[in-house]
Amino acid sequence: MKKSGKSIQMALALLAAGTLLLNGCSAAKPAEKKSIRIGVTLYRGDDAFINNIRSSLEEKAKEYEQQTGIKVNLEIMDPKGNQNTQNSQVDRFLSLEYDAICVNMVDRSAASYVINKAMDVGTPVVFFNREPVEEDMKRWEHLYYVGEDARESAVLQGEILVDAYQENPGSLDLNEDGTVGYVMLEGERSHQDSLIRTEWSVQTMRDGDIPLEKLTGGSANWDRSQAAALMEQWIRQFGDAIEVV
């Protein structure tokens, strides 16, 4: 397994654009490759963040073509949040002998299906944004994961609030009751990055001696309308007691 901490858009695009293939994952030597075919399956195409990745990937594929003269045939498919549909898309890519596939898993625990199929035909797989379990990623040398460092981003979030509190406690303790009331709005309860960010953002604030009081929390599943609905509900319930979200 190889894991990258680079920006997910940039790293995914570079990996998907053939860097892996031209460094030993493909049977053909770099000089022999005139084009590469990459199949991409997203967990849900209507997700704003995933759409940004899609746009970045398409842009970087074009840049790669211009820089190397190697044609990048990129096919991006949307399983609309259905794991069975995603499995069928993976089957299609492999049956058509794509050079590599990039998979944003609908269900990260179902990665073994993708891995088994890819290993059977020797096609490298780049997982992104949703990391399969460690046991799956260790099964084959041509499995890769590209994603953010969730703990690092969570610690940075917490440190911003710690710095603000240390400079002026009243900037967070708005009602001056000696505690900082917060609500935790999560992306998706089963997403590993969401779980890590939740844990370490709070831990960093506690380590920085912010007197925290959790009022409530909930998951909006990366959906803006769900997040807005939760916040409206919490504001009605807790009002000015909410000092940090």
Language-model features, listed with the residues they occupy:
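A residue-level marker of the well-folded mature domains of exported/periplasmic proteins
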Residues: K2-K6, C25-V245
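Hydrophobic core
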Residues: A16, L20-L21
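Sec-dependent signal peptide recognition
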Residues: K6-L14
